[in-house]
Amino acid sequence: MVLVITFTLARTLLFLGSSVYTFILWFSLIVRKNLVESFPDKDLKEIKAIERKFYHFFCDYVVEVIKMFSISQKEMKRRMVFTNLDEVRAELEKNDKKFCFLYLGHYCNWEYIASLTAWIPGMHGGQIYHRIYNQAFDELFLRLRGQFGGESILMKDTLRRILTLRKQDKRVMIGFISDQLPKWENMNHWTRFLNHDTSFFIGCERIAKQVDAALYYVDVERVKRGYYRATFRLMTLHPKEYPD
């Protein structure tokens, strides 16, 4: 029996080790390929320097996300600071804006942005999310993103949920991470980005026009390891004035 258990454990560890090695190899090849294609003017030495910075950054992100499962709201507010929220709220009230949509990307620690709800008492905060294929991970990240009171809105339910929120008497602030690849049927806007022909999501713009939402870009910067600062940059208070 001991031999059987030992053999099974050894085989499992070998399988896991092989899988991890394969993933790391695949990941490193993708990173190198993307950097070389995006920055054709840089030599291999410069590319490798960017790679090293990226891997350090990514590892910090993983550790920070794990820490989020046990972090207090007080500590979270020390590590993720939103600098000009009072100005934003005053602008929304002055222009009688019920909705504020936030554009941001997968930069710095985007999971920290979900703590925004802790900074906006009296407002309904949330973020649009795409369901993770693995159910256990999906439930884990839903709990992570909702621990400070924010609502995670499934991407396919975005418009329906926002129209429901419009009937409620409160101001709403919702984050859209819009730097992923849209599905083929949603590839309506193309541009040249990082030396690639790139399609962008336009759903946020369309919904903003329907509910007359203010649009802000969330400019996130890393202050030091584990600490971030976000500044809201006004894009427009009147999205209907712009052509599709």
Predicted regions and their residues:
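Soluble catalytic domains of membrane acyltransferases
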Residues: 69-244
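Membrane-anchoring hydrophobic helices of lipid-metabolizing enzymes
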Residues: 1-104, 109, 138-143, 149-150
